[in-house]
Amino acid sequence: MDEGTQFLVTELERLLSLPFDSKSQVEAWYAESKRVQRELPERFPDLEYPHEVWHFLADADIRARDAGYRQYQEKMMTDYIRRVRDENRVA
């Protein structure tokens, strides 16, 4: 797995593990998400990844209000992480 993909997958796993139940937790989540959003293009400008990753990084307020959307986005991210890890096990 290339360094950029490893960075992204690790950060997504970390973001998925952060608490997300109160307004202050959502605000803290956004702060971490913004850091990732800054670092990705700075460190890995050519990294390609699914468009849904940006929605995940930007839509925490919607996930906080809509449990169905939260489940959908979290599943999209865990599926992406699993797919990337599986592809690299085979390679």
What are these regions (language model features)?
Residues 19-27, 41-44, 62-67:
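Charged, low-complexity interaction regions
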Residues 5-8, 46-50, 73, 77:
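Short runs of predominantly hydrophobic/aromatic residues within well-ordered alpha helices
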Residues 52-91:
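Amphipathic alpha-helical binding modules
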Residues 31-39:
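Amphipathic alpha-helical segments that form the core helices of the histone-fold
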Residues 1-31:
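Short terminal alpha-helical segments
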Residues 11, 32, 52, 56:
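Short acidic/histidine-centered micro-motifs embedded in hydrophobic/aromatic stretches
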Residues 42-56:
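Short, well-ordered alpha-helical segments
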Residues 13-20, 34, 58-61, 85:
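Alpha-helical repeat scaffolds in large eukaryotic proteins
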